[in-house]
């Protein structure tokens, strides 16, 4: 039987308004177009490949459908995935998929040849209902505001806001060599980037093109080895020369370039009204599309120095690597303009969600904790992620009240602050 404290906490979680400060929902059509959009979401897709499915079985490009048109009819993609779906029954992604099918659609959690076509019809019919996305986001999730980083589509509907992601300071990545990254910068810029002055003008022109006046935040995916070492203008000139010549760069050179570029970007942003920066760290995507967590000891000191240099900005941070759990908590504890948010990519699993919540409650003032960000591409995937996050929050808070570590009133205040008040204040929501 549920105790009074646990019931009060559960009631607060059931009733709280939720602000989702990072998603990839399409403004014109936030919901899934078909069942394949749901079943082959990239978190599921990569596990199916890892379990034995061919890289090109359900997408001709061998890439997630969020990045490339799969070029294969949805029903055929699903049929090809069926032999591999049983292999992920144990994973959190597999559980999330079952929750979507069962809770939102009333379908069996396990798809097979006998029920596949009916499941496809049900999803198609729901998607044709004008109120479907509103039902999922508002009624089932309680999400009253979202910020999408997707650029395509018409103006955002009510309660959906826009943001942009940009990383003009990452001169190398898991999929691209420095000369390839530099070429992509030059394509955006419209001319060669050969000197630090060229690079500074590239950043300035990029800020102008973004139209940041209409954005709720600028999202920055930082290299974990960002460092003030080798971040002088002359160091940037050396990096640009070596990248142009297709010469290898050291980690220190890449980290210094990143540090210089981020500082330069923030200086340019000071010419605009935008002061909210969303920082994500701890993931690198290797070819063909295999994301891994990554960590470097330089990051914590570098971001603390940047936050100190740019105290007029708000930095809301999330990580895909559990190694940053304590680091981000201590940053938010000690640095006034740094706060923490959600559980991104490789940390969106119950064990790591619990660890993050416990760490943040232990050390971060409650007005600097953001409980949730979906990172979802379709509204249906917001549902299981939020369901899990709320479940773990409920367990953690109930245990703390039972131990006498906090009272029920504090627990309820934490829920309201972390799920709505804090993200609404940080990101300017109503």
Predicted regions and their residues:
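Metal-cofactor-binding active-site regions of metalloenzymes
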Residues: 3-271, 313, 329-430
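Catalytic core of soluble alpha/beta enzymes
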Residues: 227, 235-240, 260-263, 274-328, ...
């Amino acid at each position: 039987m549920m105790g009074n404290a646990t019931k009060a906490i559960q009631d607060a979680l059931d009733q709280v308004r939720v602000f989702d400060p990072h998603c990839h929902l399409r403004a014109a059509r936030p919901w899934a177009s078909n069942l394949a959009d749901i079943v082959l979401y990239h978190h599921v897709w990569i596990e199916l490949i890892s379990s034995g499915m061919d890289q090109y079985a359900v997408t001709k490009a061998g890439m997630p459908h969020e990045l490339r048109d799969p070029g294969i009819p949805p029903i055929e993609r699903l049929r090809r995935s069926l032999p591999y779906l049983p292999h992920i029954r144990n994973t959190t992604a597999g559980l999330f998929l079952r929750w979507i099918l069962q809770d939102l659609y009333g379908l069996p959690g396990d798809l097979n040849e006998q029920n596949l076509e009916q499941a496809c019809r049900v999803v198609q019919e729901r998607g044709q209902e004008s109120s479907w996305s509103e039902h999922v986001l508002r009624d089932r999730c309680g999400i009253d505001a979202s910020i999408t980083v997707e650029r395509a589509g018409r103006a955002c509907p009510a309660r959906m806001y826009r943001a942009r992601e940009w990383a003009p300071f990452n001169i190398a990545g898991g999929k691209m060599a420095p000369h390839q990254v530099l070429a992509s910068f030059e394509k955006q810029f419209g001319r060669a980037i050969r000197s630090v002055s060229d690079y500074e003008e590239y950043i300035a022109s990029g800020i102008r093109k973004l139209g940041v006046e209409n954005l709720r935040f600028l999202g920055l995916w930082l290299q974990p080895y960002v460092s003030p070492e080798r971040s002088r203008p002359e160091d940037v000139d050396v990096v640009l020369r070596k990248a142009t010549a297709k010469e290898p760069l050291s980690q220190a050179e890449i980290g210094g370039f990143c540090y210089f570029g981020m500082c330069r970007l923030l200086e340019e942003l000071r010419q605009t009204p935008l002061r909210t920066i969303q920082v994500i760290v701890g993931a690198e995507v290797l070819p063909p599309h295999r994301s891994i967590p990554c960590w470097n000891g330089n990051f914590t000191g570098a971001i603390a120095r940047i936050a100190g240099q740019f105290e007029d900005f708000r930095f809301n941070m999330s990580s895909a690597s559990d190694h940053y759990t304590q680091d981000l908590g201590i940053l938010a504890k000690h640095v006034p303009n740094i706060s923490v948010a959600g559980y991104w990519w490789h940390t969106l699993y119950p064990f790591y969600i619990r660890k993050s919540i416990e760490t943040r409650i232990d050390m971060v003032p409650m007005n600097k904790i953001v409980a949730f960000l979906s990172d979802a591409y379709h509204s249906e995937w917001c549902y299981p992620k939020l369901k899990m996050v709320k479940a773990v929050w409920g367990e953690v808070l109930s245990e703390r009240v039972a131990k006498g570590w906090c009272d029920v009133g504090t627990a309820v205040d934490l829920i309201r602050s972390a799920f709505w008040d804090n993200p609404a204040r940080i990101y300017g929501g109503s």
